[in-house]
Amino acid sequence: MKALTLFLLIFISVSIVSAQPIVVIVRHAEKATNGGNDPDLSSAGQARANELARILKDSGITAIFTTEFKRTQETAAPTATSAHLTPTVVAAKDTAALVAKLHQLNGNALVVGHDDTIPNIVKALGINSSISIPGTDYSELLIVILGDKPELFRLHYPDDAGI
């Protein structure tokens, strides 16, 4: 976990020096099995959301974007509280609106999406390689460094129990 935090801090430092914004993209954390189409996070998901906030604590996040679904909002909530930010809700399928907002930022952002929306977001940010997020994977942490030639870095982060 210390290695992941160090890795993030290095990339955030590079971003600050080069004035290139960084977009951190994660899939929402584990969801409860009940709750229909809009479930809350499970206890494992809450633990993962708390760990995300801990990892991003000193990352210079100045904006947070979620979708209209509770699971993305609950994943972002601990980071928003820690950073004293109010997340912006963007419709899950409105990739163009989200990317437009990201390109207007003068800072780093956290985007909490879904396994089926993240590949489109990454592509719209200028990353040419295609990615997929397995429906059972909640640990992907993608870092996109914006600029003339955006760069993508793929990491994984555990919940606080280390899963």
Regions found by a protein language model. Give the residues of each.
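Bacterial Sec-dependent N-terminal signal peptides
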Residues: 1-20
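Active-site-proximal alpha-helix that buttresses catalytic centers in soluble enzyme cores
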Residues: 20-106, 117-132, 137-163
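Conserved alpha/beta-hydrolase "nucleophile elbow" surrounding the catalytic nucleophile
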Residues: 114
